[in-house]
Amino acid sequence: MAPPSYLVHGHMTNLLTWLATSDDHPLVTSCIFHYEFEFIHPFEDGNGRMGRLWQTLILSRWKPLFAFLPVETVIRERQEEYYAALAQADSAGESTPFVEFLLDAACGIERGRYFGYGMHCSRHRSS
């Protein structure tokens, strides 16, 4: 559930400040930002598209190749999972389920290739 409209400005200010100062890996940062943006829900319509656009922007500033990869298409193809991951994260009260889904989706774009900084996508998941 989105916060009341009078809190949106403060939440967005905090989110953008966090983005500017985050030391997390850009893949993780982009996913957390995307989730928090969706939670804040600053617009009446188009929040999903804007969240995905922000994620692409964050990733492409890290690795310009992301500006040309079909992140939006992959998420659209897995739309039910996308919304389920959002709901699961909302229920859990934290972004981990959504971050895990988005990282898996990003790995699906270029399965088996290195994204840099020692991160490698693979089909193997630890339990």
PLM regions: where:
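FIC/Doc superfamily catalytic core
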Residues: M1-S127
